[in-house]
């Protein structure tokens, strides 16, 4: 489909669309462009970040143990602990599935499935191919533009909440250091946690700096690991949707007047070959994210309820800082699941339209072999592609609505327990 020069330009253009995600992935130890041994040196940084974050779990546990009866105080502690534990799970999954993720991302960036499509080679002498190519390029460009928008919105949401946590703790500690006597104040860490042995050390070196390092590592991977991992999902999911839409556009022209009747069977076979490639790619994407996203969906059920509860507490105490922080947290955490469910719904819908595309061609006036291929494809496309969350649910808008309702019930439960 593409000449070598066009393929190189396409690869550069797609890289520019996701360059923020790729550059950010380096900072959490993921090299999405080089799976070789040299490119895997960054794995050491992944291990350092994950071990440091696991060490900070001690501070969260101590916070929970001391204030176990103060639900408003431990709610945020529990939520952030669950968040960085999920991020650690994603980081370690990246370590073991690095080659698989790299290959999928490479296929997407290079439009490998479109380049392998026999239609553009065997039917290159037909005038309809130029029209199809323009439609396919327009479709793929539209979905890659959508990919960039989603990644940037997600990135800015995570930057806002992580920056708020860090700057708020840093500024408050400096203010207390210069305005209050030594030993008369408690330090505030980026994430709510407690280290009893160093509780009265204040800002002394190295006690304060060790605590800040551990909690900053946890805070950083909460936001940036999410953007890196979920950003890959956005790229692969929307690229798959673009491939399905492009396949539909190819199939729709199977009985066009621009395709000679004696070549329509061969044309349809090329579409069937492309369908099989798209089906294999969609299955690989589903298998790659199927189980690891289950922890994220479970976490979001609790964290949405916790965030709503913290917002209600901040509203009752007239705490604007808590309200702003929880609002930003809810936006980032909510957008994370919206990305999965909304794109998963687009994925499933595009898959269902493939069968309709085969049925809508004017097959009733074609040869017996052509009609036989159409019947075969109607049977094969009867079961569409979808993105699953383990074995329990599907990434779709109904799943999103069910999660919102469940989180609301969890929020009401927390309020009732807090009032007793």
From Swiss-Prot:
Described purpose of this protein according to its UniProt entry: Odorant receptor which mediates acceptance or avoidance behavior, depending on its substrates. The odorant receptor repertoire encodes a large collection of odor stimuli that vary widely in identity, intensity, and duration. May form a complex with Orco to form odorant-sensing units, providing sensitive and prolonged odorant signaling and calcium permeability. Involved in the behavioral responses to butyl acetate, isoamyl acetate, and hexanoic acid.
Transmembrane segments: 44-64, 77-97, 151-171, 218-238, 297-317, 321-341, 388-408
Family per record: Belongs to the insect chemoreceptor superfamily. Heteromeric odorant receptor channel (TC 1.A.69) family. Or63a subfamily.
InterPro entries: 7tm6_olfct_rcpt
GO biological process: detection of chemical stimulus involved in sensory perception of smell; signal transduction
Protein name per the record: Odorant receptor 63a
Domain of life: Eukaryota
Location within or outside the cell: Cell membrane
SUBUNIT field: Interacts with Orco. Complexes exist early in the endomembrane system in olfactory sensory neurons (OSNs), coupling these complexes to the conserved ciliary trafficking pathway.
Keyword field: Cell membrane, Glycoprotein, Membrane, Olfaction, Receptor, Sensory transduction, Transducer, Transmembrane, Transmembrane helix
Bilayer topology annotation: Multi-pass membrane protein
Other facts noted in the record for this chain: The atypical heteromeric and topological design of the odorant receptors appears to be an insect-specific solution for odor recognition, making the OR/Orco complex an attractive target for the development of highly selective insect repellents to disrupt olfactory-mediated host-seeking behaviors of insect disease vectors. Odor-evoked OR currents are independent of known G-protein-coupled second messenger pathways.
GO cellular component: cation channel complex; dendrite membrane; plasma membrane
Cytoplasmic side of membrane: 1-43, 98-150, 239-296, 342-387
Side of membrane Extracellular, spans: 65-76, 172-217, 318-320, 409-420
Residues that carry a glycan: 318
GO terms assigned for molecular function: ionotropic olfactory receptor activity; odorant binding; olfactory receptor activity
């Amino acid at each position: 489909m593409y000449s070598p020069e066009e393929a190189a330009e396409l690869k550069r253009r797609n890289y520019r669309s996701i360059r923020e995600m790729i550059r950010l992935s380096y900072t959490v130890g993921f090299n999405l462009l080089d799976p070789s041994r040299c490119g895997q040196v960054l794995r050491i940084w992944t291990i350092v970040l994950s071990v440091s974050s696991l060490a900070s779990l001690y501070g969260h546990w101590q916070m929970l143990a001391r204030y176990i009866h103060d639900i408003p105080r431990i709610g945020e502690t529990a939520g952030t602990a669950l968040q960085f534990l999920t991020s650690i799970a994603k980081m370690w999954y990246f370590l073991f599935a690095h080659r698989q993720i790299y290959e999928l991302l490479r296929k997407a960036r290079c439009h490998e499935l479109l380049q392998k499509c026999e239609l553009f080679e065997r039917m290159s002498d037909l005038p309809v191919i130029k029209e199809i190519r323009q439609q396919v390029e327009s479709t793929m460009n539209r979905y890659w533009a959508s990919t960039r928008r989603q990644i940037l919105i997600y990135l800015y949401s995570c930057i806002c909440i992580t920056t708020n946590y860090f700057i708020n703790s840093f500024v408050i500690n400096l203010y207390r250091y210069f305005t209050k006597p030594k030993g008369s104040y408690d330090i505030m860490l980026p994430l709510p946690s407690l280290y009893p042995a160093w509780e009265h050390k204040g800002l002394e070196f190295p006690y304060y700096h060790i605590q800040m390092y551990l909690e900053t590592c946890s805070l950083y991977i909460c936001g940036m690991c999410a953007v890196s991992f979920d950003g890959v999902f956005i790229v692969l999911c929307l690229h798959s949707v673009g491939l399905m839409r492009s396949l539909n556009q190819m199939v729709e022209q199977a009985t066009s007047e621009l395709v000679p009747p004696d070549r329509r069977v061969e044309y349809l076979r090329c579409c069937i070959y492309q369908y099989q490639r798209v089906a294999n790619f969609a299955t690989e994407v589903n298998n790659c994210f199927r189980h690891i996203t289950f922890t994220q969906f479970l976490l979001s059920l609790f964290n949405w309820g916790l965030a709503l509860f913290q917002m209600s507490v901040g509203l009752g105490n007239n705490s604007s800082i808590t309200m702003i922080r929880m609002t930003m947290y809810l936006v980032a955490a909510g957008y994370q699941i919206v990305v999965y469910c909304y794109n998963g719904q687009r994925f499933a819908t595009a898959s269902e339209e493939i069968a309709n595309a085969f049925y809508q061609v004017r097959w009733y006036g074609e040869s017996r072999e052509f009609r036989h291929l159409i019947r075969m494809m109607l049977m094969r496309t009867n079961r569409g592609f979808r993105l699953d969350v383990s074995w329990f649910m599907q990434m779709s808008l109904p799943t999103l609505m069910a999660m919102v309702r469940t989180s609301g019930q969890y929020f009401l439960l927390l309020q009732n327990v807090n009032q007793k």
